[in-house]
Amino acid sequence: ELEKTIAAAMNEISNSRQGQTSISEFEIPAYSNDGKLKLYELLLRKYSDLINEFEKKTVGEIKSMVDRDNLTVQSLCERFVAGDYSFERNYEAAVSKVLEFISGEIVYVKSDIDLNFWLTPNEILEKMVGDDEDIAVLLCSVLFALGDEKAEVVIAEMDNRTTHALVITEHNGKFFIFDATQKHKINDFSGDKAGVLSRYSFRGSRIKRFLYKFNRNNYEQFM
């Protein structure tokens, strides 16, 4: 319930910054609900330490978030593959569709409140909102369900001193970066690893270094 409340609050704050807030099935101007949004933000800031403590995860728990057996992940995966799906033949085409859906339909929200919590795939798709880490874990889980055991979530330090989550993998001799928080084609960030890492950017910022990466089977920290 705590995670759902936070997600709902972040979703309404995000919508308000785009000019409108959803209340039931009606849309009203953001200023009409300004008090409610301020209260959400105040509560999140006030209880941020408690939330962060509650949301702490062990390495094992972090790895387990990349879950191909999750029913929501499986359902999402099935939307983009045919019955005769082959990892070798059809993987990149399926990823292209998944990437287009997630980047186009799920609203990326970067909270300006110091909160560290993780949404489940079901919560992300219920509210159609998530931060970069939530979205990266969801994408990596779908890639895992498509048969990609090399895909990993990476938390990177950017050259503007922020952090950003993305997904890396290798397929048919090519290195890929997938970032579903921004719209891009599957091959925009693909090729030799050094070239891809130097070419990738998020809102004008480039990767300075990897902090840590993980998937279902591995966790590696670089700090």
Report each predicted region and the residues it spans:
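A structural boundary/capping signal
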Residues: E1-M223
